[in-house]
From Swiss-Prot:
Annotated Pfam families: PetL (PF05115)
Protein name per Swiss-Prot or TrEMBL: Cytochrome b6-f complex subunit 6
Natural source organism: Angiopteris evecta
Keyword match Chloroplast: yes
Family to which this protein belongs: Belongs to the PetL family.
GO CC annotation: chloroplast thylakoid membrane; cytochrome b6f complex
The protein's role, per its UniProt record: Component of the cytochrome b6-f complex, which mediates electron transfer between photosystem II (PSII) and photosystem I (PSI), cyclic electron flow around PSI, and state transitions. PetL is important for photoautotrophic growth as well as for electron transfer efficiency and stability of the cytochrome b6-f complex.
Swiss-Prot/TrEMBL keywords: Chloroplast, Electron transport, Membrane, Photosynthesis, Plastid, Thylakoid, Transmembrane, Transmembrane helix, Transport
Transmembrane annotation, as ranges: 4-24
Primary localization class, coarse: plastid
Quaternary structure and partners: The 4 large subunits of the cytochrome b6-f complex are cytochrome b6, subunit IV (17 kDa polypeptide, PetD), cytochrome f and the Rieske protein, while the 4 small subunits are PetG, PetL, PetM and PetN. The complex functions as a dimer.
GO biological process, one term: photosynthesis
Bilayer topology: Single-pass membrane protein
GO molecular function per UniProt: electron transporter, transferring electrons within cytochrome b6/f complex of photosystem II activity
Amino acid sequence: MLTLLSYFGFLFAILTLTSVLFIGLNKIQLI
């Protein structure tokens, strides 16, 4: 159970980081 929770937390962190980086790159390109 603990490993599953940590695995999902890791996936969520990666998805959040990639989405933030993607939005940041799009904003830089829009300027």
